[in-house]
Curated annotation (Swiss-Prot):
Glycans are attached at residues 148, 167, 229, 269, 283, 405, 417, 474, 498, 706. Pfam families: 7tm_2, EGF_CA, GPS. The gene is Adgre1. The keyword Transmembrane helix applies. One of its GO terms (cellular component) is cell periphery. Residues 673-679, 736-754, 822-839, 898-931 are cytoplasmic. Residues 1-27 form the signal peptide. One of its GO terms (biological process) is adaptive immune response. A motif (Cell attachment site) lies at residues 506-508. In macrophages; but absent from those which are localized within T-cell areas of lymph nodes and spleen. Low level of expression on blood monocytes. Residues 32-80, 81-132, 133-172, 173-221, 222-271, 272-318, 319-367 form the EGF-like domain. This is Adhesion G protein-coupled receptor E1.
C-alpha cells in the first residue's frame, strides 16, 4: 500500500515541478528575469523554480538539502544523498537485502529466496517487490546419488539414504557387517547395497526359523544332528553332538585306526586302546583289559584309597612301612630301616650279621660282636669324636687325647689281626702305663674321666676276649702287673651244669656256673676271664654314683673288677654270676655296701646298682649276685646322714609350708575385695609365680627318666623362677616409689603405672631370656640327675646373671627405701614416733629383704669355713619365702586380719574397715583403677 502512496507523491511532485517551470517562462514572457536559466543557480541534484520576482531550489527525490529546508536559495547549500536503507521501516521487505545507490535504493533477495521477476528491484519502481523461498530440491542433481533432499526456509540439506554413509560430497554404501555388530553369535553377516542380512553358520538355525534375518532379536541355535538322525554314525560308533556339527567316535577304551573326518560317518572298526601308556601313578603297574584298564601298586606300596586295583588318577601308591607293621621283620638283635618299596635290615650296636646264617626275607640273623674295636667306641662318645677331630691341637684336650690315643693303640693291636694270638701280658703292661698316669687322670673333667674309664674297661674286655678266642700256647693264663691282675680260662673239656668255674685276681673272685657258659652260646672253645684293677677306684670313685641315697656319705671300698665270657649272650642269664670283692678298708657296722656296675648308657659312664644284689657282706668281703657280665665295685653308704640330706629335708618341708602360705595369700588377694588395690595385684602375680615354680620343683626336679620331658621341666623352671625375680624387682621399684612419694609432694606415684605394662615386664622379659638361652645352647636344659640348667657348661649363668643383677638392684632400692622411711619417721612428732605401729612398720620393712629375694645373696657366700652355715641360712630363708609373704602381706595387715575375723565369725560390721599405718609397706590404698 505504501508503494501506491509513494507513486502518488511522485506524481504530484512532477506536476508541481512542471508548474514551477512553466510559470517563470510565463513570467519572462510577461517581462521578468528568469534566474533558473542559469544552471549554476541551484546546486547539483536540485531543481530551480522561478517565481515572479525570485526563485527557489528544491533537492531531487532521494536527496536532502544540507540546511534541512525543502526550498532554499543561495550558495553554500548542497543536496546530499539520502540512505533509504537506514530508515526504520526497511523499504525492501523481509528476506531481502537493501543496497543504497545515489538517489535511490536497490532491493535484492537473500540466498534461497527470489522475487517474482527474479531480478533486483529499484526503490520507486512501479511493480511490487516480494522475496519468496526458493525450493532448491526441485533442481535436478543438487544432492548426490543415494541421498534425499530436504528443503528449508532459505536453504536445503542433503541426507544419505539408510545403508549409505557420506564420504566427502558423495554417499557410499555402508558395510554394516564391518562397522556394526548387527548379527548374533554363530551367524554370518552379508552386506548388500544399502542393507545387509544374517545367516546362521552351518549346523545351526535361527530362532525365527527363516534362512535370513536382520538384527539381534533372533539367535542361532545348535542343531542336534545326533538326535535328529540316530543312524548318522552307524551302529558301532557313538555320535557326539558339538556346536554346529557332530562327530563320530569309538566307545571308551576303543579307537579308530584310520583318520576320521569330523562330522562324517565313521568307516572301519574300533579297536581296543592300550591305556597303559603313562596312565598309572608312580610305583604302580598297569593292566590293559578290553575297553578299559586298571592299576596295581608295586610290592611294598599300597594305594591311597585302599583298593588293590584302581583307575582313579588321583590315587597314589604310598610306601608301606614294613618296619612299623612288624617290629620283628628283621629278627632279633636287628634294626629295620624302611626304604621306598622295601626295607633294609641291620644289626644293633654290639651285633653283626651272621655270614653263616640265612639272609632270606624275614630270616636276617645278627650275632653279638664278641669284642669292640676303636671304630665302635668312637661312635659311642662325642668326647672321643671331638678328640679325634682336633688331633691334639687343642691344648684343652691335649692330656685327655694323649690317654685316649694310648688306649686306642692297645685296642688297635688287638683288632688289626683278629686271627693272630693276643698277648695278654703285653696288653696288661700297656694298660698299666695308662693307669699309672694318676696325676693326668685327676686333672681331667668329670665327663673326660668317665669317657676315658669306659674306653679303658672296654679295651681290657676286648683284649681278654681276643685272647680267649684265639688262645696262645697257654690256654689258661694268670697275668699280674702293678695296676691289674687277669686270670683267664679256656674250657676244653665238657662243663657240666652243676659245676662252676672259679677265677681270682688280687683277692677278688668270680664264680661262673657252667650253665652260664652254655647260655652264652660260645663259638668254638668257650672261655671266661676275670680282671681286677688296682687304684682305679680312686679315679672312677663315688662321685660317678647316681642314686637316691646320695644324701648319705659314700665311699669306694673295693677295687674295680670285670668279667667276660666268649659267648654272644652276656646279660639276663637265668642264674646269677657270683662276685666276691675284697674291701680296701674294713667295713664299719654303720655302713651298708652297695654293689654297683659301670653303665655306659648313662651319660659317658656311671655307677648304677641295677642288675646286681648283695648276697652277704662281712667286714672284709662283699658277695654280689649279678645277672650279667659287668665291671663291678663296692660302694659303702654310711649310716650318718650328710649335710645334703639335712638341707634336703629343710628345703622340702619349707617348700611345702610356703606352698600352703602362698595358696592362702593368693586366695586372700583374689577374694578379699576390701584389700584389693594396685599393690595387692602385684603381690598376687608374685605369689602365683612362686607357687607354680615351687610346686613344679617339688614334683618334677628329679624326673630324669625321659630326657626330653626333663628338658621341658627345666625350661619351665627357668622361666618361672626368672618371672619370680622380675616380679620381685617390680615390687622393689613400686615400694621405693611409694615411700618416696610420702616425702615429696606431687612426686611420681606408683599408681601412675598401668598393670598391663607391669605384666609385660614381669612375664615378657623372662620369656625373652629363656628363648635366647635355648637358642644359644639348646642342650643346656636337663641333667642326668636333675631337671635343671646344666651347671657344668656355664649355662647356669643364663639364670644366675639376671638373678644377680636383680638382687643388686633390689638391695640398693631397699636400702634407699629404708633410709627415706627413717627420715620420714624422724620428721614426725615424738608422740607419733613412739607408737607401737612404728615397730611393726620397721619389722615389715626389714622383712622385705626376704620377700624381694635379697637373701639369695647368701648362696654366693657358701665358701670357706662358713659354707655350711650359709647353706643352712640360704635353704631356710628361701624355702620359706612364701611364708614370709603371707606373714607380712596378710597376717600383719590389720585390714586383712579383720577380713579373716569376719569370715570366721560371719559378722558384717563395716566399721572394721579402718586404715592403719601398718598397710604402708604391704598394700597402699589406691582409688585409681587398674591399668
Amino acid at each position: 500500500m505504501w508503494g501506491f502512496w509513494l507513486l502518488l507523491f511522485w506524481g504530484f511532485s512532477g506536476m508541481y515541478r512542471w508548474g514551477m517551470t512553466t510559470l517563470p517562462t510565463l513570467g519572462q514572457t510577461l517581462g521578468g528575469v528568469n534566474e533558473c536559466q542559469d544552471t549554476t543557480t541551484c546546486p547539483a541534484y536540485a531543481t530551480c523554480t522561478d517565481t515572479t520576482d525570485s526563485y527557489y531550489c528544491t533537492c531531487k527525490r532521494g536527496f536532502l538539502s544540507s540546511n534541512g529546508q525543502t526550498n532554499f536559495q543561495g550558495p553554500g547549500v548542497e543536496c546530499q544523498d539520502v540512505n533509504e536503507c537506514l530508515q526504520s521501516d526497511s523499504p525492501c521487505g523481509p528476506n531481502s537485502v537493501c543496497t543504497n545507490i545515489l538517489g535511490r535504493a536497490k532491493c535484492s533477495c537473500l540466498r534461497g529466496f527470489s522475487s517474482s521477476t527474479g531480478k533486483d528491484w529499484i526503490l520507486g519502481s512501479l511493480d511490487n517487490f516480494l522475496c519468496a523461498d526458493v525450493d532448491e530440491c526441485l533442481t535436478i542433481g543438487i544432492c548426490p546419488k543415494y541421498s534425499n533432499c530436504s528443503n528449508s526456509v532459505g536453504s536445503y540439506s542433503c541426507t544419505c539414504q539408510p545403508g549409505f554413509v557420506l564420504n566427502g560430497s558423495i554417499c557410499e554404501d555402508e558395510d554394516e557387517c564391518v562397522t556394526r555388530d548387527v548379527c548374533p553369535e554363530h551367524a554370518t553377516c552379508h552386506n548388500t547395497l544399502g542393507s545387509y542380512y544374517c545367516t546362521c553358520n552351518s549346523g545351526l538355525e535361527s530362532s525365527g526359523g527363516g534362512p535370513m534375518f536382520q538384527g539381534l532379536d533372533e539367535s542361532c541355535e545348535d542343531v542336534d544332528e545326533c538326535s535328529r538322525n540316530s543312524t548318522l554314525c552307524g551302529p558301532t560308533f557313538i555320535c557326539i553332538n558339538t556346536l554346529g556339527s557332530y562327530s563320530c567316535s569309538c566307545p571308551a577304551g576303543f579307537s579308530l585306526p584310520t583318520f576320521q573326518i569330523l562330522g562324517h560317518p565313521a568307516d572301519g572298526n574300533c579297536t581296543d586302546i592300550d591305556e597303559c601308556d603313562d596312565t598309572c601313578p608312580l610305583n604302580s603297574s598297569c593292566t590293559n583289559t578290553i575297553g578299559s584298564y586298571f592299576c596295581t601298586c608295586h610290592p611294598g606300596f599300597a594305594s591311597s584309597n585302599g583298593q588293590l586295583n584302581f583307575k582313579d588318577l588321583e590315587v597314589t601308591c604310598e610306601d608301606i612301612d614294613e618296619c612299623t607293621q612288624d617290629p620283628l621283620q628283621c629278627g632279633l638283635n636287628s634294626v629295620c630301616t624302611n626304604v621306598p618299596g622295601s626295607y633294609i635290615c641291620g644289626c644293633l650296636p654290639d651285633f653283626q650279621m651272621d655270614p653263616e646264617g640265612s639272609q632270606g626275607y624275614g630270616n636276617f640273623n645278627c650275632k653279638r660282636i664278641l669284642f669292640k674295636c676303636k671304630e665302635d667306641l668312637i661312635l659311642q662318645s662325642e668326647q672321643i669324636q671331638q678328640c679325634q677331630a682336633v688331633q691334639g691341637r687343642d691344648l684343652g684336650y691335649a692330656s685327655f687325647c694323649t690317654l685316649v690315643n694310648a688306649t686306642f693303640t692297645i685296642l688297635d693291636n688287638t683288632c688289626e689281626n683278629k686271627s693272630a694270638p693276643v698277648s695278654l701280658q703285653s696288653a696288661a703292661t700297656s694298660v698299666s702305663l695308662v693307669l699309672e698316669q694318676a696325676t693326668t687322670w685327676f686333672e681331667l673333667s668329670k665327663e673326660e674321666t668317665s669317657t676315658l674309664g669306659t674306653i679303658l674297661l672296654e679295651t681290657v674286655e676286648s683284649t681278654m676276649l681276643a685272647a680267649l678266642l684265639i688262645p696262645s700256647g697257654n690256654a689258661s693264663q694268670m697275668i699280674q702287673t702293678e695296676y691289674l691282675d687277669i686270670e683267664s680260662k679256656v674250657i676244653n673239656e665238657e662243663c657240666k651244669e652243676n659245676e662252676s668255674i672259679n677265677l681270682a685276681a688280687r683277692g677278688d673272685k668270680m664264680n661262673v656256673g657252667c650253665f652260664i657258659i652254655k647260655e652264652s652260646v660260645s663259638t668254638g672253645a668257650p672261655g671266661v676271664a676275670f680282671v681286677s684293677f688296682a687304684h682305679m677306684e680312686s679315679v672312677l670313685n663315688e662321685r660317678f654314683f647316681e642314686d637316691g641315697q646320695s644324701f648319705r656319705k659314700l665311699r669306694m671300698n673295693s677295687r674295680v673288677v670285670g668279667g667276660t665270657v666268649t659267648g654272644e649272650k652276656k646279660e639276663d642269664f637265668s642264674k646269677p654270676i657270683i662276685y666276691t670283692l675284697q674291701h680296701i678298708q674294713p667295713k664299719q657296722k654303720s655302713e651298708r655296701p652297695i654293689c654297683v656296675s659301670w653303665n655306659t648308657d648313662v651319660e659317658d659312664g656311671r655307677w648304677t646298682p641295677s642288675g646286681c644284689e648283695i648276697v652277704e657282706a662281712s667286714e672284709t668281703h662283699t658277695v654280689c649276685s649279678c645277672n650279667r657280665m659287668a665291671n663291678l665295685a663296692i660302694i659303702m653308704a654310711s649310716g650318718e646322714l650328710t649335710m645334703e640330706f639335712s638341707l634336703y629335708i629343710i628345703s622340702h618341708v619349707g617348700t611345702v609350708i610356703s606352698l600352703v602360705c602362698l595358696a592362702l595369700a593368693i586366695a586372700t588377694f583374689l577374694l578379699c575385695r576390701a584389700v584389693q588395690n594396685h599393690n595387692t595385684y602385684m603381690h598376687l602375680h608374685l605369689c602365683v609365680c612362686l607357687f607354680l615354680a615351687k610346686i613344679l620343683f617339688l614334683t618334677g626336679i628329679d624326673k630324669t627318666d625321659n630326657q626330653t620331658a626333663c628338658a621341658i621341666i627345666a625350661g619351665f623352671l627357668h622361666y618361672l623362677f626368672l618371672a619370680c625375680f622380675f616380679w620381685m624387682l617390680v615390687e622393689a621399684v613400686m615400694l621405693f616409689l611409694m615411700v618416696r612419694n610420702l616425702k615429696v609432694v606431687n612426686y611420681f606415684s606408683s599408681r601412675n603405672i598401668k598393670m598391663l605394662h607391669l605384666c609385660a615386664f614381669g612375664y615378657g622379659l623372662p620369656v625373652l631370656v629363656v628363648i635366647i638361652s635355648a637358642s644359644v645352647q639348646p642342650r643346656g636344659y636337663g641333667m642326668h640327675n636333675r631337671c635343671w640348667l646344666n651347671t657344668e657348661t656355664g649355662f647356669i649363668w643364663s639364670f644366675l646373671g639376671p638373678v644377680c643383677m636383680i638382687i643388686t638392684i633390689n638391695s640398693v632400692l631397699l636400702a634407699w627405701t629404708l633410709w627415706v622411711l627413717r627420715q620420714k619417721l624422724c620428721s614426725v612428732s615424738s608422740e607419733v614416733s613412739k607408737l607401737k605401729d612404728t615397730r611393726l612398720l620397721t619389722f615389715k620393712a626389714i622383712a622385705q629383704i626376704f620377700i624381694l629375694g635379697c637373701s639369695w645373696v647368701l648362696g654366693i657366700f657358701q665358701i670357706g669355713p662358713l659354707a655350711s652355715i650359709m647353706a643352712y641360712l640360704f635353704t631356710i630363708i628361701n624355702s620359706l619365702q612364701g611364708a614370709f609373704i603371707f606373714l607380712i602381706h596378710c597376717l600383719l595387715n590389720r585390714q586383712v586380719r579383720d577380713e579373716y575375723k569376719k569370715l570366721l565369725t560371719r559378722k558384717t560390721d563395716l566399721s572394721s574397715h579402718s586404715q592403719t599405718s601398718g598397710i604402708l609397706l604391704s598394700s597402699m590404698p589406691s582409688t585409681s583403677k587398674m591399668g
